[in-house]
Amino acid sequence: MKAFTTLQGLVCPLDRANVDTDAIIPKQFLKSIKRSGFGPNLFDEWRYLDHGEPGMDNAKRPLNPDFVLNQPRYQGAQVLLARENFGCGSSREHAPWALDDQGFRVVIAPSFADIFFNNCYKNGLLPIVLAADIVDQLFQECEAAPGYSLKVDLAAQTVFTPSGQAFLFDITEHRKHCLLGGLDEIGLTLQHADEIKAFEARRRVEQPWLFA
């Protein structure tokens, strides 16, 4: 998993509330269990003018010119700005996979669905909850200023605007530790590799019948 420390990232404003996981990555693309390759189908039903299916050449599909991801000023965005209850609906880890594959490292919203929120942390994506009035302000600033970017400092748990405003956000120490170190659940386990090996060696001596 990629470590997250600080990010200065272009912001893409998705001005929709209650964006569910089927909108983030439609169900027909869930057959793959690889974590890569989902970016071109992120927000597929809004992004393209036709119906997407696995195996289609996305480069040849007609784009929806009104959708934010297709607008030149938001190309290369790493921060997604969203409205309340982002990531609601069915549980699918493919949703943060698709956001990550598109290049997003941070999602900022007033609230998130619980399962999506937890899945983000497991996949190196930082979901940040800010008050609705602050999110409103960020939308206004982003839409008014092409090239609008935010600095996110995870160690300081702070979002900085171009004007220098600072907004604190909450995160548990455990999740912060994992993101700063780029540690998923396997990585956390491997931090205790020596203790695990010592336990297994001790068990072979104390309970040899288990290994006969």
Swiss-Prot record:
Keywords: Amino-acid biosynthesis, Branched-chain amino acid biosynthesis, Leucine biosynthesis, Lyase. One of its GO terms (biological process) is L-leucine biosynthetic process. Its EC number is 4.2.1.33. The keyword Lipid metabolism does not apply. It catalyses: (2R,3S)-3-isopropylmalate = (2S)-2-isopropylmalate. Pathway: Amino-acid biosynthesis; L-leucine biosynthesis; L-leucine from 3-methyl-2-oxobutanoate: step 2/4. The keyword Amino-acid biosynthesis applies. Belongs to the LeuD family. LeuD type 1 subfamily. PANTHER family: 3-ISOPROPYLMALATE DEHYDRATASE SMALL SUBUNIT (PTHR43345:SF5), 3-ISOPROPYLMALATE DEHYDRATASE SMALL SUBUNIT 2-RELATED-RELATED (PTHR43345). Catalyzes the isomerization between 2-isopropylmalate and 3-isopropylmalate, via the formation of 2-isopropylmaleate. This is 3-isopropylmalate dehydratase small subunit 2. It comes from Chromobacterium violaceum (strain ATCC 12472 / DSM 30191 / JCM 1249 / CCUG 213 / NBRC 12614 / NCIMB 9131 / NCTC 9757 / MK). The lineage of its organism: Bacteria, Pseudomonadati, Pseudomonadota, Betaproteobacteria, Neisseriales.
